[in-house]
Amino acid sequence: MRIGKAAEDLACEYLVRNGHTVVERNWRSGHLEIDIITLDSAGIHFVEVKGRVAPVTADPEENVGYRKQRRLASAARAYLNSEDKKSLIDQKEAFFDVFSVIFEGGKAEVKYFPQAYIPINT
């Protein structure tokens, strides 16, 4: 199984267990992509998933830098502005979350960072 897909599967399972409803996976528009989009009682979540196989030199979540954050914010805006998604704009809040998975010896270490960042000037 592909590392990215396995990490996204774990992220979806975790999020559903914690009150989220998954509405999209691997949403794309041109060069923009969002790994997972969920809804919960607080609003809509745009989730970036990072998966790595141990040993790692840096935690996967550290790979969501400023440029990636800007691209994700642009993707979220494109998603919400698409004609069939306009009703989601009524959600209370939009959140940008990061989900990290490190695979080692048949086990997975998962970390969820809700509201990992707030996009600015996108």
Where are these regions (language model features)?
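Acidic-basic catalytic patches of nuclease active cores, encompassing PD-(D/E)XK
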Residues: M1-N26
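Short acidic/glycine-enriched loop/turn segments that link adjacent beta-strands
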Residues: S29-L32, G106
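Short, low-complexity, polybasic intrinsically disordered segments
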Residues: S100-T122
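Conserved catalytic cores of phosphodiester-cleaving nucleases, focusing on short active-site segments
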Residues: I34-T57, L72
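Short, glycine/acidic-enriched loop or turn micro-motifs at the edges of active sites
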Residues: W27-S29, G51
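Hydrophobic "anchor" residues on beta-strands that sit immediately upstream
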Residues: T21, I44, E93
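Catalytic cores of nucleic-acid endonucleases
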Residues: G51-E104
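Protein kinase-like catalytic core scaffold
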Residues: L32, H45, F95-D97, K111
